């Protein structure tokens, strides 16, 4: 919307300046005219050649957008509506509005305009009507008001004459002041609407930021820490061996340990005491060849088995 408003402003300002600069007004005519009750009055205005084929009309009101049409040229160069007629002279680039049998109610603000796209070109004419007892012109005469622009052709009066001491004021006019005010008001409304829309969008973004403060904080931290850091890494490669070395085989010795099934008891048996005494006296023991050493083995009887030697 902001871009749309910025795009609309320059052409509008240029259009307004075009109507305010002297010499750029497309229509010229009298700013005020005076007529007499019961008589006829002609109002002539002149237009530029580029509006030669456009429709011309005469309306009552001070605002062109709300002006009430009285008479308008259609397919022909002349049209009539009651006591008011309009005639378009395309050769001289003028059109004349004739008001017949004037009354006091005819006094007011009128507009002479050219129908164009968008905003019509127009100028405002103040019509004054005076009672018939005030001599303005000789009876039965018709007065015609003409335009004498500096940059266009000049046309003199064709019927009657303007009495001495009575002067008509001709002022070039563009868009009337109410039209300009309405255009400015429209642009102001457009600007206010654009500002409100931008404010609403800003409020929505603020509400979303308040709902997710952690996310906003993380985004801020990420933006603060967005500086790039670089580290140089050096990789050392090991030289390849020609042949892979097979893993060394460790010799393993296995041994089986078995518990004895029976407990062994050993007993020393001494056969005579004399030998013990001789040993005590220091005599070396002697052993007869006939004597043999006997060994005995004592086993613990098993449970449930009877002794074989009672």
From Swiss-Prot:
Residues 136-168, 271-310 are annotated as: Disordered. Keywords: Cell membrane, Disulfide bond, Glycoprotein, Immunity, Immunoglobulin domain, Membrane, Phosphoprotein, Receptor, Signal, Transmembrane, Transmembrane helix. SUPFAM superfamilies: Immunoglobulin (SSF48726). Disulfide bonds join 45-112. One of its GO terms (molecular function) is phosphatidylethanolamine binding. Phosphorylated on tyrosine. The modification Phosphotyrosine is found at residue 295. Residues 200-310 are cytoplasmic. Residues 27-178 are extracellular. It comes from the Eukaryota. The keyword Signal applies. Belongs to the CD300 family. Upon tyrosine-phosphorylation, interacts with PTN6/SHP-1 and PTPN11/SHP-2 and INPP5D. This is CMRF35-like molecule 8.
